[in-house]
Every structure is written in C-alpha cells, then in structure tokens.
C-alpha cells in the first residue's frame, strides 16, 4: 500500500511525469492532492485501506501539497506539462483556471450512470448549497462534488450579552443598535470584528440580491451598483465610530480581539466555522455563543459556502478515471467517513444523513460554548443553516478569484484609507478587467 504525505512539490519540477517520481509506475495508483495534515491523513488512511482491499491491484497516494493555493499552483503546472493528478482539492475559481485547457472531468458522466452513479435520493442527501457549487460555471456541467465545508457565523460573548440583557442581532439593522449600545457601555471596545472583507462584501450583496458577478454575458463584473455602495458606506460609518474592525485593519484574524479579556476587545466576531476552536478564550474566561450571520430586514438569510470540493482531472485511461470516481463516491462521500472527518477537522459534513448517525448525534450533544464543545456547537449551527437551505455560491469563471479579491479591497480602502466610493469601485472594476 502506498500512502505518502508530501509537504512541498511532489517532484522537483512540474515538468517531471507523475510516473517518474521515484521511478514508480502510477498506472494503477490514484494520485490525490490535498491539504490534509497528519491528523486528517490518519482519518483518510482507513478509507484508502478499504479501497485497496476492495479493488486489489489499485492504490491511492495521498499527498499534502501545502495550502489551497499551493494545490492550485502545482495542479496548473502539471496540467501545463500534460501530467494531470487524478483527484484534487479545489475551490470554484481553481476549477475555472484548470478548465481553460478543458482538463476537468464533467462528473455528470458518472453521476448519471445507471451502475456507477447516484440515485435521486442519494443526490438529495447532499446539502443542496454545497452540491450546487459543482455546477456554478455557467455551462451546464458538473465539475466538482463537495468534500468538507464551512461557512461564516456570528460568534458572540454569551456571558456579556446575558449580563447586559442584549439580544443577539439577526439583522444588520439590529446589529447597528447592539454595537452602539456596547460601545457606550464599554468605550474602549471595538464591538464587532470581521475576519474576511471579501466574504463580507459578497455575502451582503447576495443577501440584498444585488448584482456581484456573472459567469455568462458580456460583462462578468456587476458589483458596482447603488445597493453595494450603500452597504460599504454603512460599514464605513460603523468603522469611523470604532464600532467594528476587520482582519486587514486589525492586522490578523479578529478572533484575537474577540477572545481578549482586556478593555480593548470585541464582543462579536464573524468568522469561519472551520476556525471555531480559535474563538474560545483561554480557560473558558467567558461562554461563547454561535448564531447565523445577520441579514438585512426583509431579506432571506444567505451564508457563503466555503471549504474544499473534489474534482477529477482527465486521464488517458478510462479505467483509471472510473476507479478515481469509485474511490471518491464509495469511500470519501459516505455517511460514516463524513462523520469521522467532520469530528476531526471541525468542517461540516456534506451529507445530511451524517447528522442522523448515532456517533455524530453524540458528538453534537456535547455542543457548548467552551473549548471542549465549540466545534460541535459550530456544527450544530451549520445543521440549522443546511435545513433552511441558506448556503449560496457565486459564479465561477476565469477572473472570479480577482473579483473576490478586489471587492474585499473596496472595503479595506474605503474604511482604512478613506478612499471615496467612486474611486474604490472604479479601481476594482479596472483591476478585474485587466485580468479578464
């Protein structure tokens, strides 16, 4: 059995063939590139062993290739060299780049196969927002399946909220009232921290149903509109009153401000469910609560879908692609594996049936706002969001990654540098069009 964890480039140069790495024949080896550290590789190893027992003669080589950007960059290099890995962690904008050379497998070929594919009931078991990400490319194809997901939630200091008799805000309008009150009662505080300016812009645009981007049409970049400008101006007003800060302004993740017990602290933090363990103070100095992020009055709640999906890259061998599909479907996207991986990683399962598994129900029963139970509390919040179908994904295309970065910069520049709305939005549109 060949299971190998690598922490850099798989070979010295991208021009080397996969088969030449160590002089091995990889014709019956599924090469799987991901970002899993040792603890998650230990969760993955039994799935690999089970696959290799069921299909003698086939092996899986799992390799940690740094972070998500490293996986993307190395995959692009190997595609250019004509040496595709079989299965890779991906985000939607990564897939759009890979598909410039038409190297991503349309999974509909397998999903709809009467023997290899999914039934309607099995498809319905996927959390809808996670599953829909695979077809967000504007061409009708299905390029990815979800693997492990996260979203953003509102972490709040439950102890302070109860002491101050404050309700947790469910709308941005309520948020403004709460942060105003907290600032009055705790003058040195910065009541609200935001971990991602990019997500803040994209999510609030989705909540307002305001144009952001489109994978089709003559213009991809639609985010310069009055609705989005009004939202940025709202956050600018809050920042000027020291009601809020962001990762860029604070200099690091605002969870550090949230878990602080000094006078300069925050009482709410909008961050990833995947980072729930970082939102708990030392020695459980206060209890943490988790709530959905606010939305605007009169709008539906929408929460961004994040975390890695899986995509298959084209191979000369049809048999190898089929075996890659079998490994993915039969061993990674199962209720049992999803439960184990979620409990170990803190990311959310992608199958709804996982939440009914006795072991996972026991895990959720330990949900508390403490160090011991925060991961389960985070997963519990995500279960609620999945039941209300609140997750969304943005269109993916070549240039969508640039758009994401540029809208985040709008918030950064307007808040911290005092850039005018006209200049900030115009610069962002110009930079997007340069890279299109």
Show where each model-derived region lies.
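Hinge/lid segment of periplasmic solute-binding proteins
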Residues: 93-151, 204-206, 289-294, 369-382
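Short, solvent-exposed loop/beta-turn-alpha elements that line the ligand-binding surface or hinge
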Residues: 108-126, 210-230, 281-282, 295-303, ...
């Amino acid at each position: 059995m060949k299971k190998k964890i690598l922490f850099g480039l798989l070979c010295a140069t991208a021009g080397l063939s996969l088969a030449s790495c160590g002089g091995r024949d990889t014709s019956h080896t599924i090469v799987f590139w991901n970002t899993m550290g040792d603890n998650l590789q230990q969760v993955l190893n039994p799935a690999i062993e089970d696959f290799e027992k069921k299909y003698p003669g086939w092996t899986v080589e799992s390799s940690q290739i740094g972070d998500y950007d490293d996986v993307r960059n190395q995959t692009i290099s190997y595609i250019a060299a004509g040496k595709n890995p079989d299965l890779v962690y991906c985000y939607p904008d990564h897939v759009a780049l890979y598909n410039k050379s038409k190297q991503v497998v349309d999974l509909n070929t397998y999903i709809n196969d009467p023997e290899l594919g999914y039934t309607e009931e099995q498809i319905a078991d996927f959390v809808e927002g996670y599953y829909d990400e695979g077809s967000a490319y504007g061409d009708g194809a299905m390029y990815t399946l979800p693997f492990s997901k996260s979203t953003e939630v509102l972490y709040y200091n439950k102890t302070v909220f109860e002491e101050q008799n404050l309700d947790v805000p469910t709308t941005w309008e309520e948020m403004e009232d709460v942060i105003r009150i907290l600032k009055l009662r705790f003058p040195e505080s910065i009541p609200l921290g935001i971990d991602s300016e990019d997500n803040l812009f994209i999510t609030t645009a989705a909540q307002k149903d305001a144009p952001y981007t489109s994978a089709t049409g003559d213009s991809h970049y639609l985010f310069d509109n009055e609705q989005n400008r009004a939202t940025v101006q709202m956050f600018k007003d809050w920042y000027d009153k020291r009601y809020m800060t962001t990762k860029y302004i604070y200099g690091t993740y605002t969870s550090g401000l949230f878990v602080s017990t000094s006078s300069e602290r925050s009482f709410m933090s909008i961050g990833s469910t995947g980072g729930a363990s970082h939102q708990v103070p030392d020695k459980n100095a206060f209890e943490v609560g988790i709530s959905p992020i606010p939305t605007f009055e009169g709008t539906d709640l929408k929460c961004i879908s994040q975390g890695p999906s899986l995509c298959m890259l084209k191979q000369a061998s049809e048999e190898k692609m089929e075996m890659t599909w079998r490994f993915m479907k039969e061993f990674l996207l199962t209720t049992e594996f999803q439960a184990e991986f979620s409990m170990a990683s803190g990311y959310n399962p992608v199958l709804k049936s996982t939440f009914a598994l006795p072991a996972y129900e026991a895990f959720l029963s330990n949900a508390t706002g403490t160090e011991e139970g925060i991961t389960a509390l985070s997963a519990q919040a995500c279960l609620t969001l999945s039941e209300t179908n609140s997750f969304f994904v943005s269109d993916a295309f070549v240039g969508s990654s640039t758009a994401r970065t540029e809208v985040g910069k709008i918030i950064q520049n307007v808040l911290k540098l005092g850039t005018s709305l006209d200049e900030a939005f115009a610069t962002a549109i110009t930079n997007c069009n340069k890279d299109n």
